Amino acid sequence: METTTKKARSLYIPYAGPVLLEFPLLNKGSAFSVEERRNFNLSGLLPEVVESIEEQAERAWLQYQGFKTEIDKHIYLRNIQDTNETLFYRLVQNHLEEMMPVIYTPTVGAACERFSEIYRRARGVFISYPNRHNMDDILQNVPNHNIKVIVVTDGERILGLGDQGIGGMGIPIGKLSLYTACGGISPAYTLPVVLDVGTNNQQLLNDPLYMGWRHPRITDDEYYAFVDEFIQAVKQRWPDILLQFEDFAQKNAMPLLTRYRDEICSFNDDIQGTAAVTVGTLIAASRAAGSQLSEQKIVFLGAGSAGCGIAEQIIAQTQREGLSEDAARQKVFMVDRFGLLTDRMPNLLSFQTKLVQKCDNLQHWDTENDVLSLLDVVRNVKPDILIGVSGQTGLFTEEIIREMHKHCPRPIVMPLSNPTSRVEATPQDIIAWTEGNALVATGSPFSPVIWKDKVYPIAQCNNAYIFPGIGLGVIASGASRITDEMLMSASETLAKHSPLVNNGEGLVLPALKDIQVVSRAIAFAVGKMAQQQGVAVKTSAEALQQAIDDNFWKPEYRDYRRTSI
């Protein structure tokens, strides 16, 4: 179903009466004109007054304000989305800064945990393991033929909350909402998918309301065969799809990305999207301090697929700035629950092995511990940047932050774990422990910190700055793959839009109200790089920009004309 053509063109549709009112992509509610009500058998089915979308949005905003809890606000917005998608996106667009934390992190975490309890109406595709041999038929049941973006999860590692089974569907729904709200991708082009391979969450298995397959998770060869069946079915149904892997467990995330990134246009937002926005933030923060990222020493807490993905992209950026690969890797230190990753540590995962430090280079360190803790690393490395992707709250202690600040006058501290209940340290504490000198960026939204009568804005290192623009760029350019260079171009473009760099003050990342401008710029950079990399047909810059404009959907009602099926 095409919904992105210019507003001047009417849309010819075959649906009428109550069926039309039940179709979220087409429903206008009280905004159907008198003529449309007559032509589509809606007379008497709606109140007398014909309203504009702004009048509808104002009523919805007043209703929204009447809800007291974030989860109730989330449920309300999801209800609008499942009733009238155009109104939903107009409302979100009008109040993006207020509503983004409600439709996505941190509130979406609670929505995933309570998915079966708060379930109202079907959205997206649920593919359970018992139905694995019917995937082609299942995907044929999707009514929208022109799907261009799929976000898929298996629900095993939802934010920092772990295994949520099919409750993980809240993540693809929320992510795709941001593709549209921030990146202008028509909701008619998007499809959320959950692969229901069971759950190891005993609380869910014991819950009489749980709506997923009640079975322990399948693993190993059975699991990978199931995912492969899904990938092949998607390629058959939509050969030019952009597929985003979301919230897969560490043991599966990197292998799936490695296996499929050159087979289908795909990326993993937890690994590559998080890395791209983090690197963009660090490039901007370094420039604001009058230096380059290649001059910084960086310590990570958390050496999973997300942390290692960020580290590898940092290393790639510092090589672009002139470092050799060996010199770049010597500036990055990875700490996990077993301590600093070293070349003598057993049982490392394949993606961790290139990020170890050589024990021979650590012999001069001031420590008597066999296992090198985060405090040991901070004390000896004297880092400029500390990044948390551990998923564990409170691990950036006062002692660690003060030790870092002792050797770094303006430390950059980024507790990126989601949701807020999992953050390594709160911005309030970090600002206080560094006497107001830290630059703080978080994974979840936090209010500005007031410390000694001064206001410190807290940047949210939100993947929404990156993935909507990547999606728009891929669609506009027709890219067949997402390369590392395309991701780096997104990071560089984000850094160029930093108010702190451009104005000498303000946040290190753009305000959310400007996110559509940033997404368009990233889309152009990504599309241009795709052309340079040979994964998209080369066009002029003007043609690429026109393609971006043509694909940028706006939440506006179109005139309807009746046609037969």
UniProtKB/Swiss-Prot annotation:
Entries under Gene3D superfamilies matching the protein: Malic enzyme, N-terminal domain, NAD(P)-binding Rossmann-like Domain
Binding positions for NAD(+) per the UniProt entry: R157, D270, N418
GO molecular function: malate dehydrogenase (decarboxylating) (NAD+) activity; metal ion binding; NAD binding; oxaloacetate decarboxylase activity
Note accompanying the cofactor annotation: Divalent metal cations. Prefers magnesium or manganese.
Residues that coordinate or bind a divalent metal cation: E246, D247, D270
The reaction(s) this protein catalyses: (S)-malate + NAD(+) = pyruvate + CO2 + NADH; oxaloacetate + H(+) = pyruvate + CO2
Record CDD domains: NAD_bind_1_malic_enz
Cofactor(s) named in the record: Mg(2+); Mn(2+)
Active site residues according to the UniProt entry: Y104, K175
Gene Ontology cellular-component terms listed: cytosol
Record bears the keyword NAD: yes
GO terms (BP aspect): malate metabolic process
Keyword flag RNA-binding: no
EC number: 1.1.1.38
PROSITE patterns the UniProt entry points to: MALIC_ENZYMES
Site (Important for activity): D270
Keyword annotations: Metal-binding, NAD, Oxidoreductase
NCBIfam families: PRK13529.1
Family classification: Belongs to the malic enzymes family.
Quaternary structure annotation from Swiss-Prot or TrEMBL: Homotetramer.
Name by which UniProt lists this protein: NAD-dependent malic enzyme
